[in-house]
UniProtKB/Swiss-Prot annotation:
Annotated EC: 3.1.-.-
Self-association state and partner proteins as the record states: Heterodimer of AddA and RexB.
GO MF term set: 5'-3' exonuclease activity; ATP binding; double-stranded DNA binding; helicase activity; hydrolase activity, acting on acid anhydrides
HAMAP family attached to this UniProt entry: AddB_type2
Name of the protein: ATP-dependent helicase/deoxyribonuclease subunit B
Keyword hit for Thylakoid: no
Record-stated family: Belongs to the helicase family. AddB/RexB type 2 subfamily.
Gene Ontology biological-process annotations: double-strand break repair via homologous recombination
This protein's UniProt keywords: ATP-binding, DNA damage, DNA repair, DNA-binding, Exonuclease, Helicase, Hydrolase, Nuclease, Nucleotide-binding
UniProt cross-references to Pfam families, sorted A to Z: ADDB_N (PF21445), PDDEXK_1 (PF12705)
Length: 1158
């Protein structure tokens, strides 16, 4: 007998089915009773069935052997396990796709869509694989398709698929099978079997069957003693006229397909409409949603729409509501269901918040296996095979902790050495073949502290050698192997020999001992999956290919998931929309109801588009057909959402966040808007933080989770939460105290106590100008950098700093080589200069830190470009050498303690009358001298890799003291530079090291008559000296004789020219009279002493400067320590304004308390 029970979505048809099945079993235990449900709810259905049987038999514990609760896949295994047929080896999807790839390549010349190798992508192959399964499941004979009814695109697809399909099925036959094979075998068994006549079947919670499942149902209903099916429709009735677009079209279509079969087979069947239950809020909401009932006031209490500030607020609303309902209203955790269209969006919010509130839950979103260390190890082995010993892959392999050498007695010690080794290889640019070199061959670069620790380097080298040895041996053995069995054996032995299996077993035992059964299962499951993948590979591989072997493993693992078991029955269930759910929940949360998530419309086509499938079914002359799963899903969205709304007996919550993690505005789903309109429910706003005492209850759960919100409210003077905080402190005293103290935290660094400052710095600091400039840029950064000596991890990169060093050293070596060979720069020919530059570069590139940079081919190219730049600048000097009397005299000239050139020293007494000293040391890139008419003239040149000017605003604030300090060093070392004579200083200048040309499209290149200026001449201007100079016409004429001419323009110094009246036009804010220069020098001394005084007294401020678009935070390595936030009251930028020369000089006089004219 065939029975069809129809009810509405709110009717508990599953309960009716279980009742009937249990009674049938109880009344006659000689026949088998089957309850067939979707796999997703098999476990809960089994629990409910056994519970009913327990009540019926009045026994606490029951054992059954003829009552079966199964899914379709388990039903296949049940019937086939005792059959005298050889069950095929089921191929993993990855192995099937690999087999498909072989077939496509074998037939490539015959195909129309895959004529190019680039078209054979993993995505295209997977789409074709799913199409093959669909053709097989739909019993389609591609040869019977009428091509006249197909367009060109569909015709090409059918042509290619037929060739590939035939070969694919041929290779499968009698050897192995795809994932759908068991369903096909089940139907073959059911078609032949005579054993069903004594069996009773019940089907529940289906609205749609796959083609093979539908075949199973038809065969079972034809042969079984009794078959009962329950379906939920819009109004609890069968509608034979349902059309596409109707609310319950998909389920009505399923019923129609079955009725059509029964009628054709002349089978008797009866339909029963589930009796209407008394009206309740759930049925009222269903009536409103399906538009079968009108508005009812009670709905506004049954449905609660929630507008949340963020996904975090949304997740917290769920946790808080569950916590309070369990605590106050006698709910159990198992009474709650949380649904989301996309649970991945809530992965970092929902489960951590539930754990924080000690709420047990079961998340049935399967955990992917691809993040397990074993899978990570396989991925990095593949990358090492493809790319060689790239550092990121080798280190990642080490960090899996699967290949720990035997000499390590603790994992912590091993991990520490891996971290140190990572620091070492990054600092020295070790990658590729360099991994095979001993570490001691890199230490001469002396770029990190480890370079000076011979013993530590030896220990790390042992670790390096171990890994490179086992990997080299493994790849050497496996790369040339052609036999699949031998290749897999090499891989297996590699894992076993290196104790990977033992490591996994240790993890299993560790998790098991800790009581984490879920985690304890993972090592075993991932190892078992690896075994299955290896077997699959051996089934399909004709010849061993390491590339294909790794592809199969990684593809297989990417599809694999860890099986999950609920740790307790009383737990909140978390699931995704669209998955069948059991009934019996009291409250249901639908979260993430945004316009992009609901309805869940699928848009990505498979191998066949909806249009292709329609043509194929029209052109099919046989009985089979291809089902458009995407179209069915999209047509079923309203119905599926109605199912979710029908799951709760007491209350439904539907929520959406107004912003996502990228702070982008989100709109509510059309479903959310419809419910809001249909129920007239009041929308509740869940904020990230409470704003008043009235909001407090919407954030209160357990002491730990509520503490942060209470602390936040305590900071609001208008809210009194002291009494609640006292209760909280009684529960979690120390934690509460720490959080409360933290709430008073101000992001302001404290000054060092005098004693600590004394211990850290002493009474005397030896520092450089650039370090003191850091103090004025942000004194907290100075403390971290030069007080605590914190440094970011050094990486061997040819960055701006390294490039600058290379520029400096190139010119240093060049100047010294010219002096060493007693050459005059003016007498050099271009070829001789080039030869000297070649010699310089060869010497430099033998130095450790440059040598290791040159191991990278791209760096070689960059060095070539740097060399072009230095050549450009050197030749510019050479072309101007006869235009000036200056000659480079000193290069990279150090000054300070124990140097020939005395540094700057300043002393003062602090408030305790203790003498404090700052000694200034440093290095000048180049000092040029000229002896003219018994006078010695001098200038300082500072190399910069980008254009720079002497900025008065930055100097006034202590951020640009370098050039003035250099001038002071020149003046204080008069004897050294002028051998007892007076040294007349012209200035200190920046030399821009560049080879860039001015853009032809630049406004600067267009004359008033629209003619283009000389490109080379305009570009050369970028190389002219620019800085601070003494406005002394006599000195200038001695240095650059060409300036004596009428209306002359300097070819060496930027922005200097002789006016028509014969006077010199000096750059406005970069030129100073000798008296004005003395003021600058005095102010510079004041700045140095002031910085030294504050450093030695322990003063620290978080006061980064801003100047236009510049900020001292832009390139800071310590932003994660600063936590600087300009929105906080206590965090403020030190804003610098541009000033002119007159303002600067007045400021200096004010600061130094001076009077008088300039």
């Amino acid at each position: 007998m065939i029975n069809v029970i129809t009810g509405r979505q709110v009717d508990n048809l599953q309960n009716e089915i279980i009742d009937q099945a249990v009674k049938s079993y109880y009344q006659d235990k000689t026949h088998d009773v089957f309850i067939i449900v979707p796999n997703h709810i098999k476990f809960t259905t089994e629990v409910r069935a056994l519970s009913k049987l327990s009540v019926l038999t009045n026994k606490k514990q029951v054992a059954v052997n003829k009552l079966h609760i199964l899914s379709f896949s388990r039903l296949a295994w049940y019937f086939l396990k005792d059959e005298a047929i050889k069950l095929p080896q089921i191929l993993d999807d990855a192995a099937s796709v690999m087999l498909l790839e072989q077939i496509v390549k074998d037939h490539q010349d015959e195909l129309k869509l895959f004529q190019n190798k680039n078209q054979i992508t993993s995505g295209a192959l997977r789409q074709m694989y799913e199409a093959i399964l669909s053709v097989r499941a739909g019993n389609i004979d591609l040869e019977n398709i009428d091509n006249e009814k197909l367009n060109e695109e569909t015709s090409y697809k059918v042509h290619d698929l037929q060739i590939i399909y035939d070969d694919f099925i041929d290779r499968l036959s009698e050897k192995f099978a795809t994932k759908d094979e068991m369903q096909l075998l089940l139907n073959e068994f059911l078609a032949k079997s005579d054993s069903l006549s004594t069996m009773v079947f019940y089907f529940s919670d289906f609205s749609h069957f796959s083609l093979q499942e539908l075949t199973s149902v038809r065969l079972i209903s034809k042969k079984a003693k009794n078959t009962t099916l329950a379906f939920k429709t819009k109004i609890g009735k069968i509608d034979s006229k349902a059309e596409q677009g109707d609310y319950d079209y998909v389920v009505q279509r399923t019923i129609r397909q079955l009725e059509h079969f029964w009628q054709n087979q002349q089978l008797n069947y009866q339909t029963t409409e589930f009796p209407l239950t008394k009206t309740n809020p759930s049925s009222l909401l269903n009536g409103v949603w399906t538009k079968t009932n009108g508005f009812d006031e009670s709905l506004s209490k049954f449905l609660q729409p929630v507008k949340a500030d963020s996904r975090y607020a949304e997740a917290y609303f769920v946790a808080r509501t569950i916590y309070q309902q369990v605590a106050l209203n006698n709910y159990r955790y198992q009474d709650f269901l949380v649904l989301a269209p996309n649970l991945n969006e809530y992965e970092t919010y929902l489960t951590p918040i539930l754990r924080q509130n000690n709420i047990p839950f079961f998340n049935d979103l399967q955990k992917e296996m691809k993040y397990h260390p074993l899978v990570v190890a396989v991925e990095n082995l593949q990358q090492i095979f493809k790319r060689g010993f790239q550092t990121d892959n080798v280190i990642a392999l080490m960090k899996t902790q699967l290949f720990i050498p035997e000499w390590y007695k603790s994992v912590a010690r091993y991990q520490n050495d891996v971290d140190l080794l990572e620091n070492f290889v990054l600092a020295h640019g070790i990658k590729g073949e360099l991994w095979k070199k001993p570490l001691k061959s890199f230490v001469d670069a002396e770029v990190i502290a480890l370079d000076k620790s011979e013993q530590e380097v030896e220990e790390l080298d042992r670790l390096r050698k171990y890994f490179i040895s086992i990997l080299s041996e493994f790849f050497e053995d496996i790369e040339t192997e052609k036999d699949p069995q031998a290749g897999v054996t090499i891989f297996w032995n590699f894992l076993i020999k290196n104790r990977v299996a033992k490591r996994l077993e240790a993890w299993r035992k560790e998790a098991n001992d800790a009581g984490d059964l879920q985690l304890a299962q993972q090592p075993e499951q991932v190892w078992s999956t690896l075994n299955d993948l290896l077997k699959d590979y051996l089934l399909v591989a004709k010849e061993f290919s390491l590339e294909q072997f790794f592809d199969l493993l990684i593809s297989g693992f990417s599809e694999a998931n860890f099986s999950q078991i609920p740790s307790t029955l009383d737990a909140v269930n978390i699931s995704e929309m669209g998955m069948v759910q059991g009934q019996g929940y009291k409250q249901v949360f639908i979260i993430g109801a945004t316009s992009s998530n609901l309805p869940q419309i699928e848009k990505i086509p498979g191998f066949f588009s909806s249009e292709n499938l329609e043509q194929l079914n029209d052109g099919n002359n046989a009985s089979g057909y291809l089902e458009d799963q995407q179209k069915i899903n999209n047509l079923d969205q309203n119905y599926q959402f109605g199912n979710a709304l029908s799951l709760a007996s007491d209350k439904i919550y539907i929520s959406y966040p107004v912003i996502n993690t990228a702070n982008e505005q989100l709109e509510p789903s059309i479903f959310y808007k419809q419910l809001l309109r249909l129920t007239q429910a009041n929308e509740f706003s869940q904020h990230d933080l409470p704003s008043s005492a009235g909001d407090l209850l919407t954030f209160m759960t357990n002491p730990e989770a509520s503490l942060g919100y209470l602390t936040y409210l305590k900071g609001k003077q208008e809210v009194n939460v002291d009494s609640i905080l006292e209760l909280t402190e009684q529960e979690i005293g120390e934690v509460a105290q720490n959080v409360l103290e933290g709430s008073n935290f101000k992001n302001v660094p404290e000054n060092l106590p005098p004693k600590l400052a004394q211990e850290l710095y002493g009474d005397r600091i030896e520092t450089s100008v650039s370090q003191l400039e850091t103090y004025y840029q942000n004194s907290f950064e100075y403390f971290l950098n030069y007080g605590l000596h914190l440094k970011k991890r050094f990486e061997n990169e040819l960055d701006v700093i390294q490039a600058g060093n290379y520029y400096h050293e190139t010119f240093d070596y060049l100047v010294k080589k010219i002096k060493e060979k007693n050459l005059d720069f003016a007498d050099l020919t271009d070829s001789k200069l080039n030869q000297l530059l070649i010699e310089v570069r060869e010497e430099l590139k033998e130095k450790g830190r440059y040598r290791q940079l040159l191991n990278d081919p791209f760096n070689k190219y960059l060095f070539h470009k740097l060399d072009q730049t230095t050549s450009n600048v050197a030749h510019y000097w050479h072309s101007n050498v006869n235009k000036t009397t200056f000659r480079p005299q000193y290069s990279e000239l150090s000054f300070g303690k124990n140097q020939k050139v005395t540094g700057l020293s300043y002393s003062w007494k602090d408030e305790n009358n203790q003498k404090k000293i700052v000694d200034l040391r440093g290095k000048m890139d180049r000092v040029d001298l000229a002896k003219v008419n018994d006078r010695v003239l001098g200038e300082v040149i500072d190399y910069k890799s980008s254009a720079k000017k002497f900025d008065l605003g930055l100097f006034a604030n202590g951020i640009s003291m370098q050039m003035i300090s250099y001038l002071e060093v020149l003046k204080k070392n008069n004897k050294f530079f002028a051998q007892g004579k007076n040294l007349d200083v012209l200035g200190a200048f920046y030399q821009n090291i560049t080879s860039s040309l001015e853009r032809l499209s630049s406004d600067k290149m267009i004359l008033s008559n629209y003619q283009i200026k000389d490109l080379l001449k305009e570009s050369t201007k970028k190389l002219m000296y620019n800085g601070i100079l003494v406005a002394d016409e006599e000195i200038l004429d001695l240095i650059e004789p060409g300036m004596e001419k009428d209306r002359a323009t300097s070819e060496i110094y930027s922005s200097i020219k002789r006016k028509v009246n014969g006077d010199i036009s000096w750059p406005r804010n970069q030129s100073f009279t000798p008296d004005q220069l003395e003021l600058l020098l005095a102010y510079n001394s004041y700045l140095i002493k002031n910085a030294g005084s504050e450093i030695l007294s322990g003063k620290i401020k978080l006061d980064p400067y801003t100047y236009g678009q510049q900020s001292s935070l832009t390139y800071s390595d310590f932003k994660d320590i600063f936590f600087f936030d300009a929105m906080l009251k206590e965090n403020n930028y030190h804003k610098i304004k541009a000033i002119d020369k007159k303002t600067l000089l007045n400021l200096i006089k004010e600061k130094l308390d001076l009077d008088g004219d300039e």
